[in-house]
């Protein structure tokens, strides 16, 4: 069985260094049994980056009404009235993005960004800088935690997670100067300072398919397509952490590659 020490050693072997800023996407099942469970994986990650390092994860929200309000869809009024507002202190994380985010959020020094559907969680010296502000309409593009993550020299870590989970490539989609990007609207229940719930409308890029060709069921989206092309260049690190095949990417490099890829393949003639 793996331990905090063995996972930390594996992370260092992969290229994680003290002081690093890491955005982690993890499959705990792929990592395999670890003494102490998921909390020990978080401890190993924190040990690997040290007290000067910062970890970030894509928490989202387990009660996000994104699909229920997408592009003008109307919820049943009773359901809408009873839907809980997003609360930084108590709202759960979306399990589809990995259970590790819940354990990151439980850290005493964790900070969480205020965009309900695109909420990020961070721990470490840069946590507040990364997570604040995070407004509706700036989910994963300019003005988002992802932009600040890239700007601060972050690295993307996949622990047994698939290549379609490289969330920072949504930032590349947002900033790439290409035509015909898909946009969506949705609503989120926000808790005001007066304790009242207000449903607020957001408009943003479509993270489920930035172009029509990437929004086809059963076909790879832009994130997976770009990540696979990037891996072929060999500018990343690969290794095994626990039992998990793992990747380490320089965020700025893969984002720059992603922007160039989109321009070359889908830019205006």
Curated annotation (Swiss-Prot):
Gene Ontology process terms (BP): response to antibiotic
Catalytic activity, reaction form: a 2-deoxystreptamine antibiotic + acetyl-CoA = an N(3)-acetyl-2-deoxystreptamine antibiotic + CoA + H(+)
InterPro entries, per the entry: Amioglycoside_AcTrfase, Antibiotic_NAT-like
GO molecular function, one term: aminoglycoside 3-N-acetyltransferase activity
Disulfide bonds: none
Keyword vocabulary terms for this entry: Acyltransferase, Antibiotic resistance, Transferase
Enzyme Commission code(s) on record: 2.3.1.81
Task performed by this protein: Resistance to antibiotics containing the 2-deoxy-streptamine ring including gentamicin, kanamycin, tobramycin, neomycin and apramycin.
Family under the similarity heading: Belongs to the antibiotic N-acetyltransferase family.
PANTHER family: AMINOGLYCOSIDE N3-ACETYLTRANSFERASE, SPBETA PROPHAGE-DERIVED AMINOGLYCOSIDE N(3')-ACETYLTRANSFERASE-LIKE PROTEIN YOKD
Entry-linked NCBIfam families: AAC_3, AAC_3_II
Name of the molecule in the record: Aminoglycoside N(3)-acetyltransferase III
Species, as recorded: Serratia marcescens
């Amino acid at each position: 069985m793996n331990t905090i020490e063995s996972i930390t050693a594996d992370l260092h072997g992969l290229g994680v260094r003290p002081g690093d800023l890491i955005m982690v996407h993890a499959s705990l099942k792929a990592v395999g049994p670890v003494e102490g469970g998921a909390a020990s994986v978080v401890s190993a990650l924190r040990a690997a980056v040290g007290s000067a390092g910062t970890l970030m994860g894509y928490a989202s929200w387990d009660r996000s009404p994104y699909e229920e309000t997408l592009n003008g869809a109307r919820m049943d009024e009773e359901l809408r009235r009873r839907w809980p507002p997003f609360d930084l202190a108590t709202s759960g994380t979306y399990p589809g993005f990995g259970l590790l985010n819940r354990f990151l959020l439980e850290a005493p020094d964790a900070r969480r960004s205020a965009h309900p559907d695109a909420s990020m969680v961070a721990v470490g010296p840069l946590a507040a800088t990364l997570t604040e502000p995070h407004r509706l309409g700036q989910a994963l593009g300019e003005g988002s935690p992802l932009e600040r993550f890239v700007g601060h020299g972050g690295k993307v870590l996949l622990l047994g997670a698939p290549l379609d989970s490289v969330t920072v490539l949504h930032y590349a989609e947002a900033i790439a100067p290409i035509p015909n990007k898909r946009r969506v609207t949705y609503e989120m229940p926000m808790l005001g300072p007066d304790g009242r719930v207000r449903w607020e409308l957001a408009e943003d890029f479509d993270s489920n398919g930035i172009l029509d060709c990437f929004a086809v069921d059963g076909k790879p989206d832009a994130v997976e397509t770009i990540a696979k092309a990037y891996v072929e260049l060999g500018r990343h690190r690969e290794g095994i952490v626990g039992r998990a095949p793992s990747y380490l990417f320089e965020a700025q490099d893969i984002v720059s590659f992603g922007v160039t890829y989109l321009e070359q393949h889908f830019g205006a003639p």
